[in-house]
Amino acid sequence: MDYILIDTDVILDFFFDRKPFAEHAIQIFILCENNEVKGYTTPVIISNVYYLLNKIAKHDVIIEKLKQLLQIIDIIEIDKAIILEALNSKFKDFEDAIQNFAAENYTTIEIIITRNVKDFQQSKLAVFSPEIYLKNKNP
């Protein structure tokens, strides 16, 4: 079983039904729901998703959707050590650095799923777009 960190853009593709990316995001979440992969995210990602959804939807609706999401994926911790690693890293995007080091420090995560693959060039983990990950998973 693969253990994956699902980045903000993939979750937003799902919630905003952004074409053509939404279909791949849906397939990723179906794999999680069917226990074919173990999906994770971070508190920062959940906060960002809430903030962006709040621009177009009501608070109660967003809360319910996030609760549903958290029934199929888990949240990993971010602590001071992870923040310091991110601050001292060569990542150009601080938020991506936080996600990366949270995933790297969580012992079972092997893969980051993001459409911003180029932003994770410094990662020690495998990094795939949802489309490429799904092609590799189902050749």
Per-segment meaning from a language model:
Residues D9-V10, V44, A81, K118:
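Alpha-helix/helix-capping structural signal
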